[in-house]
Amino acid sequence: MPRTAVHSKPDDEDRPVLLVIEDDPGLQRQLKWAYEAYEVIAASDRESALAVMRDARPDVVTLDLGLPPDPDGVSEGFATLEGILAIAPHTKVVVASGHGARESARRAIALGAFDFYQKPVDIDELGFIVSRV
């Protein structure tokens, strides 16, 4: 799968920036559609996500732990979380995952995540968490 970082509406700079790190293109599109109050930037892997962090400094990040090359595990997602917080330590990261939810939630919060959301994604619930940030 090619690396991507896609802006939903780059011409509107008044909206807060939300970085969605998710390797499922369908879920990326759904989140872009659901969060019109934000300028949504989507990244599908760690490399593109960290490039966006350096360039755009998003206000909020949602992070799926199951990213390539380890989509069935959590190692790449946690490495991405650590990279995000190394670049911008005060970034509010909401981790969303279905992998070992309780253990992953504890680890994510211990590493500095703002919150944890267990998949499958409910757009309204995740939107509420993102809006709290």
Task: List each model region and its residues.
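Acidic, metal-coordinating helix/loop segments flanking the phosphotransfer/catalytic sites
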Residues: 42-60, 64-68
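Two-component/phosphorelay signaling modules centered on CheY-like receiver
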Residues: 13, 24-47
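C-terminal output helix
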Residues: 103, 121-130
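Short amphipathic alpha-helix used as the core "switch/output" element in two-component signaling
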Residues: 51, 71-90
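Short, conserved "switch-loop" micro-motifs in signal-transduction and mechanochemical regulators
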Residues: 99-100
